[in-house]
Amino acid sequence: MHTLIKGVLEEILEAEVIIEYPKDREHGHYATPIAFNLAKVFKKSPLAIAEELALKIGSHEKTQGFFDRVVACKGYINFTLSLDFLERFTQKALELKEQFGSQVKSERSQKIFLEFVSANPTGPLHIGHARGAVFGDSLAKIARFLGHEVLCEYYVNDMGSQIRLLGVSVWLAYKEHVLKESVTYPEVFYKGEYIIEIAKKAHNDLEPSLFKENEETIIEVLSDYAKDLMLLEIKGNLDALDIHFDSYASEKEVFKHKDAVFDRLEKANALYEKDSKTWLKSSLYQDESDRVLIKEDKSYTYLAGDIVYHDEKFQQNYTKYINIWGADHHGYIARVKASLEFLGYDSSKLEVLLAQMVRLLKDNEPYKMSKRAGNFILIKDVIDDVGKDALRFIFLSKRLDTHLEFDVNTLKKQDSSNPIYYIHYANSRIHTMLEKSPFSKEEILQTPLKNLNAEEKYLLFSALSLPKAVESSFEEYGLQKMCEYAKTLASEFHRFYNAGKILDTPKAKELLKICLMVSLSLTNAFKLLGIEIKTKISSKD
């Protein structure tokens, strides 16, 4: 609907047209500020240009049947859609059902490589990981809905110092809690009951002879053993959020190709030796300084592994590569992009989205940390507390790059202060009316819309605006727009529902048709957010 009108206006005016939603619904369904852009060109006031263009658009043969009104107002051109136009789109939307709001694959379709979560398999997933996980999963759902091809990958950091530290931590816990020895822990190690759990499980699972080997062998085996257990638990946590990856890439496997990548960097004159280290000339590509890839002891830095991994990704020739990282990884963006340029790739194809911090409250107090994980709030604990759907909604309700703070008790309330409940409640009200209605769904669908007032038309317009919300959410990586859309539509429906009777009116079938349209849009919006909308819900209002 939005796209059609924009295209027709651009054809008539032979200029790019921006379509907006008026702040005041009394001004119509759409507005354009094009007169302000043309004022300098024609050396006339925006008001005069708007009046001329409004007349031209309203009388043009290509817009016949589109609008009830096209008027100039303070330099803007405002459009009120006709009921015939709205009905045409309503009929098409209701026929499309779960595909309403989507697009078929076209020449504009992209091939997208989406990497997210990628938490080190050294501990359970905590609430900080969950935000990026939910965002990435919903972004993939929306991209696929819009006809794009998406591969979702989890990059498993299964080598290096952190994995060894995991093995050391489990070995020390084994000695203390299984062998009952006195242990001196290092300054840095993995804490939490989960480490003790792994140590005790290792005692039952692994051959007793292992623990008679030299300490380095024991640590190496325990590192792999603990890593595999943690990855299994991480996958279980993701399952609980209904998040599933197409691929899990092992850093250990990917890094086997490091020599070929470093040879190419060498040939590109991207490396140099200094202080017995190998450096990347990343400062040539807007990085703050050059970066070490190989340390004095000939071990590789974390960045070296990232470079090899991104080389493997870019060899697969996707249209776009999206990484979702924690905000603390901001400094890595320039250095990774620099390596891509040295390797001969177009680094602009890589987009890195940063997930900001999450602060959870309960009864206005900081949420209790997990004893099992040490100083973290586990995803599993919060899912058990408020449910998967509520958690997904709240994580998507704010821009990914802004800090998020919320009280989980809000998500347990059964009133309008709980946004996800109020959206479920709107859909529940619709289904209750449909059950009470003497009309079949087929009768309602075949009913022409002839007698709607301005408020009813606006509710229908809002329900039909889902495609624009979907498109904007993807193009701007602003998934909060989907949450805002669902909240606004639910709020408008509740206002409509509370304004008067629906079933006991001569135009009951017309109003129920609007309700079907609202339910369809809420259902499809929630599906893209990874939430199953409810058709039955209790209320304490």
From Swiss-Prot:
A motif ('HIGH' region) lies at residues 119-129. Its EC number is 6.1.1.19. Keywords: Aminoacyl-tRNA synthetase, ATP-binding, Cytoplasm, Ligase, Nucleotide-binding, Protein biosynthesis. GO terms for molecular function: arginine-tRNA ligase activity; ATP binding. InterPro entries: aa-tRNA-synth_I_CS, Arg-tRNA-ligase, Arg-tRNA-synth_N, Arg-tRNA-synth_N_sf, ArgRS_core, DALR_anticod-bd, Rossmann-like_a/b/a_fold, tRNAsynth_Ia_anticodon-bd. It holds the Pfam family Arg_tRNA_synt_N. Monomer. Belongs to the class-I aminoacyl-tRNA synthetase family. This is Arginine--tRNA ligase. It comes from Helicobacter pylori (strain J99 / ATCC 700824) (Campylobacter pylori J99).
